[in-house]
Amino acid sequence: MSITPRRHVAVGLLCRAAGLGLGIIADHIVPDPQTHHPVAVFGAAVARLEKTMYADSTRRGTLFTVTCLTPLAVIGGAVDRLTRNRPALRIATTALATWAVVGSASLAREGRAMAGHLANGDLVAARKRLPHLCGRDPDALDAAEIARGAVESMAENASDAAVASLWWGAVAGLPGLLVHRGAN
């Protein structure tokens, strides 16, 4: 019995959903690597490429963006294609990619650490922690301003790194997940 196209799509969507869900669970169970995190490695490669390629022009900026994101789309598409008839492998690769790009657990840890410092009135520690969350100069900020900066940054990062990445993963699969995080 062959699988109908409609059933094939349904299985693919179920695998995608399962992979995204398992990736979120893995994000909270499996700690981020201390060195060579996939997002950091990609960011470092983009920074190196930016020094040689980017210029302040629409054409060069477009070329730079396409050069950075096309490999992610190609890799994501190839993995999706190669795992099309292997549901367990598709779930596993989607879960692995989701774990790599969704930073909700590390963001939550940073937020809890900041909340602890502020609750204990430890402004020195809170000021040291703030650059982990945002680019504000913490030395001139009081406790309320540090809290506001932390909350604003956590909300923005939760939207960018977790919610939007998962949305693109749900809508466009592995290529969407990878390209969104790469662009972000």
Summary of predicted features, one role per range:
Residues 1-183:
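Short amphipathic, positively biased membrane-proximal segments
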